[in-house]
Amino acid sequence: MANIKSAKKRALQSEKSRKHNASRRTMMRTFIKKVVVAIEAANKEVATAEFVKLQSVLDSYATKGLINKNTAARKKSRLSAKIKAL
């Protein structure tokens, strides 16, 4: 455990952000799963509607640094291609 005051503070901040980011990552995976389930059910309307929401989430997380911007672009590109193939 840290002995220096600033190190203790950083440890607390790190733990807080870890929990916050874990929650956000779970939410992101849920959005992705909704799109994938709609694609597997061949429901283009629902898949498109969920994909619009997902794009917003991925872009905001890429901006905030939760995921890399290229990761966000790759996920959007692959899901978009699957939706277009329906």
Curated annotation (Swiss-Prot):
UniProt signal peptide: none
Molecular functions per Gene Ontology: small ribosomal subunit rRNA binding; structural constituent of ribosome
A Gene Ontology cellular-component term: cytosol
Pfam families: Ribosomal_S20p
Record keywords: Ribonucleoprotein, Ribosomal protein, RNA-binding, rRNA-binding
A Gene Ontology biological process term: translation
Keyword rRNA-binding included in the entry's annotation: yes
Stored InterPro entries: Ribosomal_bS20, Ribosomal_bS20_sf
The UniProt record lists the keyword Endoplasmic reticulum: no
Family in the record: Belongs to the bacterial ribosomal protein bS20 family.
Family matches, as NCBIfam families: S20
Free-text function comment from the UniProt entry: Binds directly to 16S ribosomal RNA.
UniProt cross-references to PANTHER family, sorted A to Z: 30S RIBOSOMAL PROTEIN S20, SMALL RIBOSOMAL SUBUNIT PROTEIN BS20C
Protein name as catalogued: Small ribosomal subunit protein bS20
Native source species: Psychromonas ingrahamii (strain DSM 17664 / CCUG 51855 / 37)
Gene coding for it: rpsT
